[in-house]
Amino acid sequence: MTLSKITSIAGLLASASLVAGHGFVSGIVADGKYYGGYLVNQYPYMSNPPDTIAWSTTATDLGFVDGTGYQSPDIICHRDAKNGKLTATVAAGSQIEFQWTTWPESHHGPLITYLAPCNGDCATVDKTTLKFVKIAAQGLIDGSNPPGVWADDEMIANNNTATVTIPASYAPGNYVLRHEIIALHSAGNLNGAQNYPQCFNIQITGGGSAQGSGTAGTSLYKNTDPGIKFDIYSDLSGGYPIPGPALFNA
């Protein structure tokens, strides 16, 4: 085998290793019940994949949406996302666990979670009509030593699990739950931030009457937002501005 072929194979293996390191949500636990997610590393290759609460996506490379796609529907629930067919039931005020398959330690960044009312059946809602309210967000935890300790680091340490509380005051109904990691390891450059959105259909029970006004998925971020174009290797003493609309506060 020639040296050039060996080098080429080594490069491909390195690229495959990097891609394999990116994760996705394999399932959630809501009110103590487990619901399987959309297994993007398996289901796209099946002739009859199972129905799930998760929205399907064509991101079989376990890739991301960057700033060039922020005005595209791909940013809403990932690339070419299609509605989940099932629904998880969760009581207002209770917790949901998002179980990520894995996550690269180098891909530091925030975890952000949104809710959007479907105003009907989430299995048929047009994703471009959804209006998202930010219900949970965690970013920089410790910036004393760049690149710092981030929400994703805490998630990794917690067995690749992130936990979010559904606001107790939230109105009952059908919602799309949008959960994402934004990887900032290349975000010092324009369009360097990497978004990994994941969507799930849930039905909230109990609760109150709050909902929030919401923001269209294609308007959540701009590629020049301070929390999107952000150098994690610089001085972090000034903190980190989590991107997107304001956090819900009932």
Curated annotation (Swiss-Prot):
Enzyme class: oxidoreductase
Thermal dependence: Optimum temperature is 60 degrees Celsius.
Activity profile over pH: Optimum pH is 8.0.
Modified residues (Methylhistidine): 22
Chain sites annotated for binding O2: 185, 194
Modification after translation: The catalytically essential N-terminal histidine His-22 is post-translationally modified by methylation to prevent protonation of the histidine side chain, and protect the critical active site of the enzyme from oxidative damage.
Compartment(s) of residence: Secreted
Name the UniProt record assigns to this protein: AA9 family lytic polysaccharide monooxygenase B
Biotechnological and industrial applications of this entry: Lignocellulose is the most abundant polymeric composite on Earth and is a recalcitrant but promising renewable substrate for industrial biotechnology applications. Together with cellobiose dehydrogenases (CDHs) an enzymatic system capable of oxidative cellulose cleavage is formed, which increases the efficiency of cellulases and put LPMOs at focus of biofuel research.
Organism: Aspergillus fumigatus (strain ATCC MYA-4609 / CBS 101355 / FGSC A1100 / Af293) (Neosartorya fumigata)
Residues the record marks as carrying a glycan: 159
EC number: 1.14.99.56
Keywords: Carbohydrate metabolism, Cellulose degradation, Disulfide bond, Glycoprotein, Methylation, Monooxygenase, Oxidoreductase, Polysaccharide degradation, Secreted, Signal
Listed GO CC annotations: extracellular region
GO biological process: cellulose catabolic process
Leader sequence residues: 1-21
InterPro entries registered for this protein in UniProt: AA9 (IPR049892), AA9_LPMO (IPR005103)
Family under the similarity heading: Belongs to the polysaccharide monooxygenase AA9 family.
